[in-house]
Amino acid sequence: MVQNIAILGASGYTGAELVRLIATHPAMRIVALSGDRKAGMAMSEVFPFLRHLDLPRLQKIEEIDFSSVDLAFCALPHATSQAVIAGLPRDLKVVDLSADFRLRDPAAYETWYGKPHAAPELQKEAVYGLTEFYRDEIRGARLVAGTGCNAATGQYAIRPLIEAGVIDLDDILIDLKAGVSGAGRSLKENLLHAELSEGTHAYSAGGRHRHLGEFDQEFSKIAGRPVQVRFTPHLTPMNRGILANVYVKGDPQAVHRALTERYLTETFLEVLPFGALPSTRDIRGSNYVHIGVIGDRVPGCAMVVAVLDNLCKGSSGQAIQNANLMLGLDEAAGLGLAPVFP
């Protein structure tokens, strides 16, 4: 049976990525698209690359009839999703791609996002959407919170190592490079071509990046005690992709073995042979994650390198993977597209 889908916030990058992926999904049909500032426009006017698809026109959220919608993807900006989702029908399944429901503790949300949560009752209901680690909870969920793209990349590299007890929990460093599409589609001076090209820079350094809240929450939960990592992201002049270099104290072979065993049966995660390192070019446009492990010149230390596409596995692809579970579909449905190369 085909499931009817609404995409709220379809005029942004993650919304367009949802449309691109669902276009070839065997069991999903897009019946509504919202884009309040572009209401009335065709998606092909906003994103010409979608011109060949037969899609509904963009409309305001309040104009959508949700009575025939099975699941809604909410690709609205952070701090906007809270009020919108609170106003949706209570029996409607929702996958949220914003940061609004990722942190379970209302106090933690206020710490990292600077204001109280507008829908704390939904915050407690939401299931964290790192699919490979929360499958059972996601299957029975009404509201799933998509992870941060940087947070997902780091967790894929580190979670199995904490679970296996093969690293020092007090010495974890994440050095991450991210593509510019992760900053969204709105006009910003620092994202202009002349400002961004031919250079790279750290941002939200010194423990200020909001995805640290997700690392704290998830790693501490696994370890059963507080775990804090050092994390610095860098903006790089590429459209898509994230590369995380994760430095840990632990035997490199044990680190590689723990990751290999944990992801052995996972469709979208591949651990490369020991010593081989991944590249963002090899996962571009796909829902795949590649992970490599190498030893360090310092004995007893290892580096884990993880790459994913921030718009796909880091956001919209992950959202569809979660929606598949929520709707009782094949988890990998619609997500088998090969990476784009070159």
UniProtKB/Swiss-Prot annotation:
It is found in: Cytoplasm. The active site is at C149. Its EC number is 1.2.1.38. Transmembrane segments: none annotated. Pathway: Amino-acid biosynthesis; L-arginine biosynthesis; N(2)-acetyl-L-ornithine from L-glutamate: step 3/4. It catalyses: N-acetyl-L-glutamate 5-semialdehyde + phosphate + NADP(+) = N-acetyl-L-glutamyl 5-phosphate + NADPH + H(+). It comes from the Bacteria. GO terms for cellular component: cytoplasm. GO terms for molecular function: N-acetyl-gamma-glutamyl-phosphate reductase activity; NAD binding; NADP+ binding. Pfam families: Semialdhyde_dh (PF01118), Semialdhyde_dhC_1 (PF22698). InterPro entries: AGPR_type-1, NAD(P)-bd_dom_sf, NAGSA_dehydrogenase, Semialdehyde_DH_NAD-bd. Keywords: Amino-acid biosynthesis, Arginine biosynthesis, Cytoplasm, NADP, Oxidoreductase. GO terms for biological process: L-arginine biosynthetic process. NCBIfam families: argC. Belongs to the NAGSA dehydrogenase family. Type 1 subfamily. Catalyzes the NADPH-dependent reduction of N-acetyl-5-glutamyl phosphate to yield N-acetyl-L-glutamate 5-semialdehyde. This is N-acetyl-gamma-glutamyl-phosphate reductase. It comes from Cereibacter sphaeroides (strain ATCC 17023 / DSM 158 / JCM 6121 / CCUG 31486 / LMG 2827 / NBRC 12203 / NCIMB 8253 / ATH 2.4.1.) (Rhodobacter sphaeroides).
